[in-house]
Structures are given as C-alpha cells and as structure tokens.
Amino acid sequence: VQTCALPIYHEGEQVGLPSLEEYNAQVRNGIPLSKDFYLRRFPVAYQFRGFHAVVMGKAKAAFILARLFNDKALRDIATRQVEYILGYNPFAMSTVYGDGYDYPPLYGAYAGNVVGAVPVGIETFENEDEPYFPIQNNCTYKEIWTHTTARLMWCVAELFK
C-alpha cells in the first residue's frame, strides 16, 4: 500500500474516526469533580465542530421553560446564551457577521459573507476543553449554517415576548 502526504486542512483531520480513547481523553480534559466524574465546558465532539446550534437549542428550551414557570433567573440564563453568540464570550467578539465592530469573516462557499449570518460556532481544539476560534476562515467552525442563524433569530424573538 502506497500512501501520500496530504496537507492538513484543520486541526481534527488527523484524529480519524471516533474511538473510546478519544472520547475518554475529551472527558478527562474537563474539570475533575471526583475520581470518576468530570465537568466539561464544551460538549464532547469527535469532529470538533462549533457548538452554536447546541447553545441556541438549549437557550430556546430555557426561554420556553422560563415563560411557562415565570422564572426570571431561567430567562436570564437563556439571555446569556444569546449574549455569548453576540460577543459576551472569551474572544469578546460577536460571531454574527455584521454585528458589532470586530466580527470575523465567515465561510460561505457560494454566498460569501451574509450580513446577519451565524457560523457553526466556537469550538475546542482537538481533545481540549478550552474555547478555540482562530482567525483563519475555515468551514469547520466559521461555515454559515442556516439552522444556527434561524435558532438565534428564534431566541431573539423570545426576548420580545
């Protein structure tokens, strides 16, 4: 079998298919709570995708529950998730194209940068549990996804209810 060396296009490309070792490494890079339990700031992910869809899905659920139970604290938690996307994050940068003054360029293969578009989102580097959102434009985390944009709009609508 002959192999050829190809360039690496993103940090997770060499990791390969999901494995139990990889899963365990990501879990153990969380904050240890005891010998067998860890708290992660980011979900375990095999392909190192961004997490805006996860954040917005949970924020929408929190908004709905806050409204049902008339719970201001829960509504504030949901609002903070929206703020995370809009710039209250470790990079102090809105990830929405055109929002604020320091937003990143996004990856749109055909449409280019679309004002108001939301990317896949802030991710982690390989098996770490630290936020990672490099400036280079890459489809792994800066690709425009319609469902992340729609979820943000869905959550922003909750702010006006």
PLM feature segments, named:
Residues 1, 7-161:
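Aromatic (Trp/Tyr) and acidic
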